[in-house]
Amino acid sequence: MAELKTVGRFAPTPSGRMHLGNVFAALIAWLSVRSKGGEMVLRMEDLDTQRTSEEYAQILREDLRWLGLDYDRETPPQSARSAVYDRYFDKLAEMGLLYPCYCTRSQLHSVNAPHLSDGTYVYPGTCRNLTEAQRATFHRAPAWRVRVPDRVWTVEDWVQGHYECNLATDCGDMVVRRADGVYVYQLAVTVDDGEAGVTEVVRGMDLLSSAPRQMYLQELLDFPHPAYAHVPMLLAPDGRRLSKRDKDLDLGQLRARVTPESLIGTLAFSAGLIERNEPVPARELAGEFRWDKLRRESIFLNSEQLI
């Protein structure tokens, strides 16, 4: 049997300039794929069309080229794939797994709603078994949820190790389409990765809890499970997660004062991939990349380290 080709992906949201956390995840994803002679796919995750734009998408492409992180093909953006998601939504509906949910945001986040220790809410199934007569009393468009089983899902993550989640108790039935008709991240990403033939998903540790949710949808929609690697978060010195609000650490600012080689070198050194903080092009790291070198804990960075 022929060995399965490695396919990875960049999946940025074109809502602003890339920040260092985006660059770090993209770098590790790229190194993993290129170290195996695999294929990189670019996909713009622009479900929220109010916050995203083609202008930022083009800037993201230019930033990736500047960094030396090439890709082999670009798939259509999520905003152009509603008809595709419709087909998979219909498949879930035909399986009898979808139901309309009329809960408001305030109801879901009320102090009386079930919450996990990190503050996220667990959907209690309020609308799961409503009768048609009860549904008729609501005079607003519903969101749509997929029923989840009382079952433990396990992820053997390349970075975080063993992780498990019972969707029924740790998540509850998941929204797959919002009341305004927009498909949500979990369904769109599952379909996009599945149709693109993605074999490994590399992204930030903050998305680890998404893996079991997507594995469940993959099983329902007949997609194979990819391998998962959730890389450490990049944090500011005060412990905040770097975001697009940290303007001094986004590529719009950094490109004016550092070279791509120095930026790649600092990230690789901070992650434990090289022994000295020195400029290095991404292509020189690919041949030596190994997952067991990568740090597991969060990485603290400030702008002075990049001068």
Describe the role of every protein-language-model region.
Residues S106-S243, D250-L254, S303-I307:
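Active-site cores that bind ATP or allylic diphosphates and position pyrophosphate for catalysis
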Residues A93-R105, R151-V155, V159-E164, E278-E297:
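A short, terminal or domain-edge coil/loop segment
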Residues M1-S15, S35, M40, R135-T137, ...:
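Non-catalytic terminal extensions that flank enzyme cores
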Residues A2-L116, M205-D206, S210-F223:
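N-terminal Rossmann-like or analogous alpha/beta NTP/dinucleotide-binding catalytic cores
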Residues A57, S82, R105-L108, T120, ...:
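Alpha-helix initiation and N-capping motif
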Residues D70, L98-Y99, S117, P260, ...:
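A general structural signal for well-ordered secondary-structure junctions
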Residues D48-Q58, A236-D238, A286-R296:
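Short, mixed-charge aromatic SLiMs
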Residues D72-E74, H225-Y228, I274-V280:
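Short, surface-exposed acidic
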